[in-house]
Amino acid sequence: MKVPIILVNFKVYETSYGRRGLEMAKIVEKVALETSTEIIIAVPATMITRVAESVTIPVYAQHVDGVPEGAHTGAVTPELIKDAGAKGSLLNHSERRVRMDEMDDALKRMKKLGLESVICVDRYELVAPMALLKPTAVLVEPPELIGTGVSVSKARPEVITSAVDEIRKVQGVYLIAGAGITSGEDVYVAMKLGSDGVGAASAIMKAKEPQKVLLDFVNGAIRALEER
C-alpha cells in the first residue's frame, strides 16, 4: 500500500460484476497507470479471480469471515480470497459488520498469508483500538454520510482530524477517510486534514464518466501531497 491511497469499493452495483465490472476495473487501472498512482479496487467475491487475472492494480475482497476452514457454508475465508488472487480485503464495513473475535482471527490468518487488511470503523474513537491490531490501514467512515454525496471532509472534518490524532498513537498503520467522497476537492481536503487517502464507492461506480471522476480524485490527492 502506497500513499496517496485511493480505494474504490465496487460493492454490488450493476457496474461491479460481469462485463461491466471488468470494464470498470480496466478504467481504474488505466487511471492508475497514467498517473503512477496505486489505486486499490475491492470487488465482489465472484469477480476476484476474473479481475485479478485481467488487471495489474491491487484487487481486494470486500469482506472475509474469521471462521476456521471446514463446515461453514457460504463463508469467505482469508485462504479462499488468497487462492482467488486477492491482495487483501476490507474488514468490518458498516454494511458487513463482523464480531471482534472473528476479525482478530481473520487478521492473524491474513498476515500469515501475506494479505493486506483495511479495518473499517464508524467513529474516530475506534481508530486507535483497531490500529493496535496492526492492520495495513484503518478506514473511518461516518455511516450516516455513506452514499449521500455529502463528504466527511466538508460535513464532519473533525472526524478526520480526531482520527489522525488517534492513528498517531500507533506506528505503521495508514489512515483512510471515507463517506460521501465525490470530488477531487473532497480528496484534497481529507488529505490536507492528515489522512493518507480516501475510500469511495458510488461516486465512481454510479458515475457517467468514472474515468473523469477518478482522475479528479487523483489530482486532488497529488495536490495535497505536494502541499504537505
Curated annotation (Swiss-Prot):
GO BP terms, alphabetized = gluconeogenesis; glyceraldehyde-3-phosphate biosynthetic process; glycerol catabolic process; glycolytic process
User: What is the superkingdom listed in this entry's lineage?
Assistant: Archaea
Listed A to Z, the keywords are: Cytoplasm, Gluconeogenesis, Glycolysis, Isomerase
Q: Cite the EC number.
A: 5.3.1.1
Q: Listed GO cellular component terms?
A: cytosol
Q: Localized where? A: Cytoplasm
Record-annotated residues binding substrate?
Answer: N9, F10, K11, I146, G180, A201, S202
Which residues constitute the catalytic centre? H93 (electrophile), E141 (proton acceptor)
Tell whether Endoplasmic reticulum is among the UniProt keywords. no
Q: Which residues form the signal peptide?
A: none
Q: Would the keyword Metal-binding turn up in this protein's UniProt record?
A: no
User: What pathway does the annotation place this protein in?
Assistant: Carbohydrate biosynthesis; gluconeogenesis; Carbohydrate degradation; glycolysis; D-glyceraldehyde 3-phosphate from glycerone phosphate: step 1/1
Matching PROSITE patterns? TIM_2
Reactions catalysed: D-glyceraldehyde 3-phosphate = dihydroxyacetone phosphate
**GO MF terms, alphabetically ordered:** triose-phosphate isomerase activity
Record function comment: Involved in the gluconeogenesis. Catalyzes stereospecifically the conversion of dihydroxyacetone phosphate (DHAP) to D-glyceraldehyde-3-phosphate (G3P).
Subunit structure as annotated in this protein's UniProt entry: Homotetramer; dimer of dimers.
What family does the entry list? Answer: Belongs to the triosephosphate isomerase family.
Full protein name: Triosephosphate isomerase
This chain's source organism reads: Metallosphaera sedula (strain ATCC 51363 / DSM 5348 / JCM 9185 / NBRC 15509 / TH2)
